[in-house]
UniProtKB/Swiss-Prot annotation:
Cystine connections: none
Keyword entries, A-Z: ATP-binding, Cytoplasm, Ligase, Magnesium, Metal-binding, Nucleotide-binding
Protein name: Glutamine synthetase
Annotated site residue numbers, Important for inhibition by glutamine: R63
Binding-site list for Mg(2+) 1: E134, H247, E335
Organism field: Lactobacillus delbrueckii subsp. bulgaricus
Length: 445
């Protein structure tokens, strides 16, 4: 579904829209969007894959002694940032993959990694891995000096009628900006938590959707600042409020048709869908390390706030990890509900696709779907059904990741080593940190 854009079209845009700078975007191993901005006079070098940068200071990239890297722009990602004006000069943006100086794809680049797993999918006869993200975020008020706070922008709740506060106005402008950038926005509404929002955009192939998520986050944060608000995609920014989730909708295409659909199957699911689902469930604990990659992620994965805690699946029931939404042939999909928006989208989709394809190869069907509320079951009832919990801490998720050869095989050795080093360091720093809760509870011992 992604459109094809030529060099000629980009050059025409540059001329007609008075583009003065080019922003070259790429993503580090943590999922953080990075940018190199160059004057438009460098357009020939940019389009000729000649833009170099120092990768030694980027998390998960290279050491100082081998720091030179090259940015290869994906022309299909070209856009002109909607908040820049022709009169003052606009900024063009291209998403890039990272290459070594000899022209080979850099194995530590998360985007290159996803392309490699997609190639494996194509070798199995599938044409597309279609993804739809539902990323939630909070809007917080700025402090007097522009500092970040955790004071929510409003006290509304799920689907509440938008009041004319700054949060509602901000959300509307985010939607308008996304549409100017070519997004097909399908819905925008207030979420469960105070100050919490959700904006859903149309699904696309995996690479395009991962690129769009990074653009989406940039737009949300940029527009929020105009309203003196801070946008946060942190999994659990406020104790006692719902956390930010990122439901991840997945389907495979084959010969232009949805390979997950079978009108005679249970919930209209094909054998391909069921075996893919089994791959996700069997490797769920390891996938969690990339789907919920921060210490804070596990403050969201607790009973009582709708986020799933148990490895299971269902149709209408929203308590399991994977749900099958009621949909037509085109919309038949798996909805993974455990993910949060701190996940690196390229690594997340690499892990999910690899696990699902492995499930298809193995041909095993998943456990029976769960019809009861998992949170109301006893431990014995869940055990009898073979339902296991997701990891409860980043430490447990790291352990599961290390032990899962299938999920590790979704990534280059460079990414596995770099990711584990970063996550183990993060956990070690957390265990050494003394929280306000601890001080209040134990200070007078």
């Amino acid at each position: 579904m992604s459109k094809v854009i030529t060099e000629e079209e980009i050059r025409k845009d540059v001329e007609e829209k008075n583009v003065r700078f080019l922003r070259l975007a790429f993503t580090d191993i943590n999922g953080t969007l990075k940018n190199l901005e160059v004057p438009v006079s460098q357009l020939d070098d940019v389009l000729g894959n000649q833009t170099r940068f120092d990768g030694s200071s980027i998390d998960g990239f290279v050491r100082l002694e081998e720091s030179d890297m090259v940015l290869y722009p994906d022309l299909a990602t070209w856009l002109v940032l909607a908040w820049t004006t022709v009169e003052e000069g606009t900024i063009g943006r291209l998403v890039c993959s990272v290459h070594n100086v000899d022209g080979t794809p850099f194995e530590g680049d998360p985007r290159n990694n996803l392309k490699k797993v997609i190639a494996e999918m194509e070798e199995m006869g599938f044409s597309d891995f279609e993804i739809g993200f539902e990323a939630e975020f909070f809007l917080f008020k700025e402090g007097k000096n522009g500092e970040e706070t955790t004071k929510v922008s409003d006290h509304s709740s799920y689907f509440d009628m938008a009041s004319e506060d700054e949060g509602a106005k901000c959300r509307r402008e985010i939607v308008e900006t996304l549409e100017k950038l070519g997004f097909r926005v399908e819905a925008a509404h207030h979420e469960v938590g105070d100050g919490q929002q959700e904006i859903d955009f149309r699904f696309d192939n995996a690479l395009a959707t991962a690129d769009k998520l990074q653009t989406f986050k940039m737009v949300v944060k940029t527009i929020a600042r105009k309203y003196h608000l801070h946008a946060s995609f942190m999994a659990k920014p406020v104790e006692g409020l719902a956390g930010n989730g990122m439901h991840t909708n997945m389907s495979l295409l084959k010969d232009g048709k949805n390979a997950f659909y079978d009108k005679d199957g249970q919930y209209n699911l094909s054998t391909t869908a069921l075996t893919f689902l089994n791959g996700i469930l069997e490797h769920a604990r390891a996938i969690t390390c990339v789907a919920n990659p921060t210490v804070n992620s596990y403050k969201r994965l607790i009973p009582g706030f709708e986020a799933p805690v148990y490895i299971s699946w269902a149709s209408r029931n929203r308590s399991p990890m994977v749900r099958i939404p009621n949909a037509n042939e085109v919309g038949t999909r798996l909805e993974m509900r455990s993910t949060d928006p701190t996940a690196n989208p390229y690594l997340l989709l690499s892990a999910c696709l690899k696990a699902g394809l492995t499930g298809i190869k193995e041909g095993k069907l998943p456990m029976a779907p769960v019809t009861s509320n998992l949170f109301e079951m006893t431990d014995d009832e869940r055990k009898e059904l073979g339902i296991k919990p997701l990891p409860s801490t980043l430490h447990n998720a790291i352990k599961a990741f290390k032990e899962d050869e299938v999920v590790k095989s979704a990534f280059s050795e460079h990414i596995v080593d770099s990711f584990l080093e970063l996550k183990e360091t993060e956990w070690a720093l957390y265990t050494q940190s003394v929280s306000e809760w601890e001080v209040k509870r134990y200070f007078n011992y």
